[in-house]
């Protein structure tokens, strides 16, 4: 009888711990989604304010440039469409999100300097800090998915492509400033999509269509 009670106690403790871990993971996922949503909204606000500050002819010229431009993230392996995104594992989506956020930590310093003080976007110098916080959160989620298993993804140890890709952009170069902002918005949209799908995929009953 005593052994049965001990066994029951251990089972209850295990259930309690597992439920607590699941609850904490959900909180971290929700927090990560909220953080990247804010960054995506901030990116959209920045580029909208930037475009509003341009002359009509400048705006028309820039609208033809970006679709043909190359972003740093284009060298980071990632799903190329909705179907591929939905078929990707939670761990893969988290790893890609981590790489994308990491790729902006250093260039975000240039991003802050590119933005005119006259633009009403708040304090752009906080972008680097927000990216660093999100990176830490995603790292914790990745460790949770690994559940103690070694990280076998070789891409995690690879250097980021073109680390100084955005750092040569001059503050007075209209085309390159727009390119910087447009790439930032594009990448934050990617990360938001990947984290939303990853969060949804954790619930088997959820409809994770994009």
From Swiss-Prot:
It is found in: Secreted. One of its GO terms (cellular component) is extracellular space. Disulfide bonds join 71-183, 200-208. GO terms for molecular function: growth hormone activity; growth hormone receptor binding; metal ion binding. Keywords: Disulfide bond, Hormone, Metal-binding, Secreted, Signal, Zinc. GO terms for biological process: animal organ development; growth hormone receptor signaling pathway; positive regulation of growth; positive regulation of receptor signaling pathway via JAK-STAT; response to nutrient levels. Residues 1-22 form the signal peptide. InterPro entries: 4_helix_cytokine-like_core, Somatotropin, Somatotropin/Prolactin, Somatotropin_CS. PROSITE patterns: SOMATOTROPIN_1, SOMATOTROPIN_2. Belongs to the somatotropin/prolactin family. This is Somatotropin. It comes from Misgurnus mizolepis (Chinese weatherloach). The gene is gh.
